[in-house]
From Swiss-Prot:
The gene is SHMT2. It is found in: Mitochondrion; Mitochondrion matrix, Mitochondrion nucleoid; Mitochondrion inner membrane; Cytoplasm. Keywords: Acetylation, Cytoplasm, Membrane, Mitochondrion, Mitochondrion inner membrane, Mitochondrion nucleoid, Nucleus, One-carbon metabolism, Phosphoprotein, Pyridoxal phosphate, Transferase, Transit peptide. Catalyzes the cleavage of serine to glycine accompanied with the production of 5,10-methylenetetrahydrofolate, an essential intermediate for purine biosynthesis. Serine provides the major source of folate one-carbon in cells by catalyzing the transfer of one carbon from serine to tetrahydrofolate. Contributes to the de novo mitochondrial thymidylate biosynthesis pathway via its role in glycine and tetrahydrofolate metabolism: thymidylate biosynthesis is required to prevent uracil accumulation in mtDNA. InterPro entries: PyrdxlP-dep_Trfase (IPR015424), PyrdxlP-dep_Trfase_major (IPR015421), PyrdxlP-dep_Trfase_small (IPR015422), Ser_HO-MeTrfase (IPR001085), Ser_HO-MeTrfase-like (IPR049943), Ser_HO-MeTrfase_PLP_BS (IPR019798), SHMT-like_dom (IPR039429). The modification N6-succinyllysine is found at residue 280. One of its GO terms (cellular component) is mitochondrial inner membrane. It comes from Bos taurus. Its EC number is 2.1.2.1. This is Serine hydroxymethyltransferase, mitochondrial. In eukaryotes there are two forms of the enzymes: a cytosolic one and a mitochondrial one. PANTHER family: SERINE HYDROXYMETHYLTRANSFERASE, SERINE HYDROXYMETHYLTRANSFERASE, MITOCHONDRIAL. It holds the Pfam family SHMT. One of its GO terms (biological process) is regulation of mitochondrial translation. The modification N6-acetyllysine is found at residues 103, 181, 196, 356, 464, 469, 474.
Length: 504
């Protein structure tokens, strides 16, 4: 168990009528009950989910049980706090508020204005940003819309962008396209050129990136990853951007919690725009943020006139009204709660533990003979290359899923198939939120190794992926092996506490 305490809210929700100093809602008053009479037998909106929709309630309980008894290793997942979940499931879901604080297209927005401004302030505080030099838009629904909004603000249709290639650890929204098709909207609306890893080192090839940028002349270079286990050299990318007169956008979706905790380098010193999700290492509700530079960009050497940044109005207009309608006020409030948590010493301790756990996981895998892309990790994840073992990520993912270990198949450099890629991506944030330490992650690697060995045995007896999956379920000996491993995994996992609500 962790030596430090994860203080999640444990008190049960109180009904509105129990809140001291607040007016009792009219439908709870005696007069309202008298007026409604028999109508009270109709819809009131006060029924619990378990009473109103037992079928959905049972599905939620099953998912909660799956999370409690399993080992969650998907690098982009985490366990949100009860406090943030309470905000997410609040009355804020009811309020429509197109526009921005003080400039809404709907009335009754006084409170949500305060909530959005509070979220903005906390976002800047979480990353130690001067409000005179940085602003933030907290309305993006998630990371992909945040990226598209940033591109829309900075670029014209068919302008050129560069991002890390998806098989090398990039993200779909960084301009991904295959040899035969434009996959992401960011490659449909803009002309994209990927940069790649050095195949010998597994690290971003900055020299080749610079050479490609000189030839391609992009308007925007994206510094961000989804399956890259090393730190990004933002200073080097800034140099490239300055040389080719491109904007630098840092997508820190995976690492924003680590940046806020100051346990890895920050992109803010070098980037023009920074985007992020809020539910990964930041451990909040699902949403997105766009940070942008403001203030003085330069001084005209001839006239001495200050030249300001123009990102603020462009970013805000791109989010609304260009791409979105009303913001999700419940999500903004939940993000604000998580951002407050991210400013605490406890969160820094948590983030340091993520790095320790990821390192322990990487070392344990190497000791067992596994190959890791780039040879290790500097952040919250490891990318295992299973090809030297003779297995692929799709088969490994399915075996692990059957023993209550959740991971995801992932492309490795040189992969040609997204259906059966050679990699398996493993992340430390979620289990660290449950209190796992280094020794616990070493045990987790032991379970993974057992699962991979089962997969290798079954692969030797089958051909196609579908045959492999069917054999896992139908072969008695294999089923017995899986059941035994699953029982040990679940017994191990249930011993650790789970953030959030107790029953859903």
């Amino acid at each position: 168990m962790l030596s430090f305490s994860f203080i999640w809210a444990t008190r049960p929700l109180r009904r509105c009528g129990q809140l001291v100093g607040m007016a009792v809602r009219c439908q709870h008053s005696e007069a309202a009950q008298t007026q409604t009479g028999e109508a009270s037998k109709g819809w009131s909106g006060q029924e619990s989910l378990s009473d109103s929709d037992p079928e959905m309630w049972e599905l939620l309980r099953r998912e909660k049980d799956r999370q409690c008894r399993g080992l969650e290793l998907i690098a982009s997942e985490n366990f949100c706090s009860r406090a943030a979940l309470e905000a997410l499931g609040s009355c804020l879901n009811n309020k429509y508020s197109e526009g921005y604080p003080g400039k809404r297209y709907y009335g009754g927005a006084e409170v949500v204005d305060e909530i959005e401004l509070l979220c903005q302030r906390r976002a800047l505080e979480a990353f130690d940003l001067d409000p005179a030099q940085w602003g933030v838009n907290v309305q993006p629904y998630s990371g992909s819309p945040a990226n598209l909004a940033a591109y829309t603000a900075l670029l014209q249709p068919h302008d050129r962008i560069m991002g890390l290639d998806l098989p090398d650890g990039g993200h779909l929204t960084h301009g991904y396209m295959s040899d035969v098709k434009r996959i992401s909207a960011t490659s449909i609306f803009f002309e994209s050129m990927p940069y790649k890893l050095n195949p010998q080192t597994g690290l971003i090839d900055y020299d080749q990136l610079a050479l490609t940028a000189r030839l391609f002349k992009p308007r925007l270079i994206i510094a961000g990853t989804s399956a890259y286990a090393r730190l990004i050299d933002y200073a080097r990318m800034r140099e490239v951007c300055d040389e080719v007169k491109a904007h630098l956008l840092a997508d820190m979706a995976h690492i924003s919690g680590l940046v806020a905790a100051k346990v890895i380098p920050s992109p803010f010193k070098h980037a023009d725009i920074v985007t992020t999700t809020t539910h990964k290492t930041l451990r909040g509700a699902r949403s997105g943020l766009i940070f942008y530079r403001k203030g003085v960009q330069a001084v005209d050497p001839k006239t001495g006139r200050e030249i300001p940044y123009t990102f603020e109005d462009r970013i805000n207009f791109a989010v609304f009204p260009s791409l979105q309608g009303g913001p999700h006020n419940h999500a903004i409030a939940a993000v604000a709660v998580a951002l407050k948590q991210a400013c605490t010493p406890m969160f820094r301790e948590y983030s340091l533990q993520i790095l320790k756990n990821a390192q322990a996981m990487a070392n344990a895998l190497l000791e067992r003979g596994y190959s890791l892309v780039s040879g290790g990790t500097d952040n919250h994840l490891v990318l295992v290359d299973l090809r030297p073992k003779g297995l692929d990520g799709a088969r490994a993912e399915r075996v692990l899923e059957l023993v209550s270990i959740t991971a995801n198949k992932n492309t490795c450099p040189g992969d040609r198939s997204a259906i059966t890629p050679g990699g398996l991506r493993l992340g430390a944030p979620a289990l660290t939120s449950r209190g796992f330490l280094e020794d616990d992650f070493r045990k987790v690697v032991g379970f993974i190794d057992e699962g991979v060995n089962i997969g290798l045995e079954v692969k030797s007896k089958t051909t196609k992926l579908q045959d492999f999956k069917s054999f896992l379920l139908k072969d008695p000996e294999t089923s017995h092996q899986l059941a035994d491993l699953r029982q040990r995994v679940e017994q191990f996992a249930r011993a650790f506490p789970m953030p959030g609500f107790d029953d859903h």
